[in-house]
Amino acid sequence: PVVVMQNSGFGVSLNAIGSLQDIYAMPCLLVITWRGYEGKDAPEHLVMGEAMPAILDAMHIPWRALGTDAAAADADAQWARARLDEKAGPVALIVKPGVLA
């Protein structure tokens, strides 16, 4: 499966994602928008924007920021596919502001 959400939704979903990962070892691509990236957003997004990479690391979820051009984005998608093939659990592609605009 693929789950697309804002990083605020990721924060709300942490327990469910962690539980599914530990119990079912289900591969899942997480596509997460990076609200609050580099402190450039509404104040309510800044805490999660700063904390998200460390949270992903603490949960042992491999992640990459999606590239800004087609070749880089394709390489990132291939990287994610390879991680999903080798890892029983979630993998994240983080979308910085403006990348998909």
Please describe what each predicted stretch is.
Residues 12, 37-41, 72-75, 100-101:
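Short, well-ordered, mixed-charge alpha-helical segments that flank or form enzyme active sites
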Residues 44-79:
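Conserved thiamine diphosphate
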Residues 11-15, 86-101:
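Glycine/aspartate-rich loop-and-adjacent alpha/beta segment that forms the canonical ThDP
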Residues 1-35:
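Thiamine diphosphate
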Residues 1, 23-29, 59-61, 86-91:
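Short coil/turn connectors at secondary-structure junctions
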Residues 5-8, 32-34, 56-59, 66-69, ...:
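Fold-independent oxyanion-binding glycine-rich loops
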Residues 13-23, 39-58:
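Active-site-proximal loop->helix
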